[in-house]
Amino acid sequence: MMTISKALPNFFEYAEHQTSYALRDVILPKDLSLLVKWMHQPHIIPQWQLNKPELELAVYFERMLCDDHQHLYIVQIDGKDVGYLEIYEAKRDRLALYYDAKKDDLGWHVLLSEDAVGQGHFRAVMRMLSFLIFEHSNAEKVVGEPDQTMSVYEKIRADIALEPQGTIQLQEKTAMLYHCYREKFYQQCGHYYKTFKRKKADKCLVEN
């Protein structure tokens, strides 16, 4: 039986402001060297705590790929691999111990590599992952639980329809629980996706 997360597409494309974004499935062992490199970058270590030897990470990501409550993606910007994304089913995740998770709720963990950080892409990447979820599932709510010290989410939440729900104490961190509701997200950000789809359709007409 196909689970909610595994039913998400293997590839999803998006664009904003003449920049192309995409999500593609993680492929092992092809992507292992990239994942090892990213997990050892200084800005990623404190949040992910996966700065482990390559063999340990190979086993870790194999297990992650076999876990049917989540879907692993590589984030691409203009065709370049620049980040990692996990989409997970909140009801079947430990997060369900900390809030009243609904069956269709989907959550995320995301990172951008050091060469993509600070380049003005994070809002678009966050909108892309929400469009992926809302366009290809029945989720009425997307959830996130970043470390409360990650101030970037507070800075951009108004631009991506994130609503803070308060802090929760996980084993390894104090997290800020965020909800992103489908209706509000499309009211606020839907025009981005409409613009992308229109430009894509126009391009197809020209090419044909």
Swiss-Prot record:
Keyword Acyltransferase recorded: yes
Name of this chain's protein: N-hydroxyputrescine acetyltransferase
Reactions mediated catalytically: N-hydroxyputrescine + acetyl-CoA = N(1)-acetyl-N(1)-hydroxyputrescine + CoA
Organism classification: Bacteria, Pseudomonadati, Pseudomonadota, Gammaproteobacteria, Moraxellales
EC number of the protein: 2.3.1.316
Pathway terms, separated by semicolons: Siderophore biosynthesis
Family, similarity comment: Belongs to the IucB family.
Gene3D superfamilies, per database record: 3.40.630.30
